[in-house]
A protein has these predicted regions:
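Signal peptide processing junction and immediate N-terminal pro/mature segment
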Residues: 19-27
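Acidic/His- and Gly-rich active-site-bordering loop/insert found
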Residues: 26-143, 152-172
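A common structural junction motif
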Residues: 118-121, 263-264, 313-323
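Positively charged n-region of N-terminal signal peptides that target proteins for export
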Residues: 1-4
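Structural recognition of the beta-strand scaffold that forms the well-ordered cores
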Residues: 61, 91, 111-115, 175-178, ...
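Histidine/acidic-residue-rich, glycine-tolerant segments that coordinate divalent metal ions
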Residues: 133-142, 148-149, 165-288, 298
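Bacterial N-terminal signal peptides
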Residues: 7-16
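A conserved active-site cap/scaffold subdomain adjacent to cofactor or substrate pockets
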Residues: 286-312
Length: 326
């Protein structure tokens, strides 16, 4: 029921936004009476209710694909096919990404965009309806963050909005875009760079919440982030025969991580930062000449994100000085 309520909410937000739009000849006047808007809200709720099976099928189907970022091929094929059947025009491989797409309907202002994520996370395979860890395939990826549900909600809301626009001759444009590789901080930045939001008046998105709760308008619960890979370069040597001849890039990685962890106590409570060592060398008896650590720096706004990023850069530079690496 909460998923259906969210579909209604998103659709109604779009209707309210569309209300003051300048319209074409023969379309509804720019300012609708409150009673007319109330009628549209009730009609939207009824249409969403009729699409419960359609919505649930999308949720389950995307869950079954469970594709990692930039590899959402089956998910993309399924979702774009569903949108084309509903009368949307689909442009594929947008912004230079094979699994990215943009579906559109209508013309003119306002331009309302729907966006939500579609990728999954590693090692999160899980049988549906089971309240304990029980993977479908051991160590396989899965939708551990609920990205199988958001696009179903957005598409349902967009389909209902399209039907009401057609029936009531409401002008405007609907856009639907997928959050490709959101877990890797992927598509949205590339969409912006490609200019896909230049004509957009507002973007509406949704994401499943903890315990299937529904909330909105709480920016303090959400953060932006910068993804950074720090690659250190040292000098290889035999770790037993002549370690003094080497300069360990892995030592630099470990010192950077140690420095960052000591600094955590003195960072804002709102920040989140995490890392993995994505390259720690080849084998223990060789001093690693190359090593890489991958960081995410999260904060509530850009200035604070930038502060974390610049602090990370200082930690990396200090690590190179201590280890005579670059």
């Amino acid at each position: 029921m909460k998923r259906i309520a969210l579909c209604v909410l998103i659709c109604l937000l779009a209707l309210v936004i569309a209300q003051p739009a300048q319209t074409q000849a023969g379309f509804m006047p720019a300012v609708m009476q409150d009673t007319k808007l109330d009628d549209l809200k009730r009609e939207a709720a009824g249409e969403v209710d009729k699409l419960q099976t359609f919505t649930q099928q999308m949720v389950d189907q995307v869950f079954s694909f469970s594709e990692l970022g930039f590899h959402e091929y089956e998910t993309t094929k399924y979702l774009t096919g569903a949108l084309e059947k509903q009368g949307f025009k689909v442009e594929r491989s947008v912004a230079g990404m094979p699994t990215a797409w943009m579906a559109t309907y209508g013309s003119g202002k306002p331009v309302i965009a729907f966006i939500t994520d579609i990728d999954c996370i590693p090692r999160a395979s899980q049988k549906p309806g089971v309240a304990y860890h029980d993977p479908i395939v051991a160590d396989a990826p899965g939708h551990g963050e609920g990205h199988n549900s958001g696009m179903a909600v957005n598409i349902t809301a967009a389909v209902v909005l399209k039907r009401l626009m057609e029936k009531n001759k409401i002008g405007g444009t609907i856009k639907i875009l997928p959050g490709v590789a959101e877990e890797l901080v992927g598509a949205k930045a590339f969409f912006i760079r490609a200019g896909l939001f230049k004509d957009v008046d507002i973007v509406l998105g949704c994401h499943v919440d903890s315990d299937f709760a529904v909330n909105w308008g709480q920016p303090e619960r959400n953060s932006g982030l910068v993804s950074v890979q720090y690659s250190f370069h040292g000098k290889a040597a035999h770790a037993a025969g002549a370690p003094w001849s080497g300069r360990s890039a892995l030592d630099a990685v470990e010192l950077m991580n140690a420095g960052w962890n000591y600094r955590r106590e003195h960072l804002r409570l709102q920040q989140r930062s995490h890392y993995v060592i994505s390259d720690g060398g080849d084998q223990p008896n060789v001093v690693p000449s190359e090593a890489t650590v991958w960081y995410y720096f999260r904060e509530l706004d850009y200035p604070h994100i930038k502060e974390l990023y610049e602090l990370g850069n200082k930690m990396a530079q200090a690590a190179t000085m201590m280890t005579d690496t670059t």
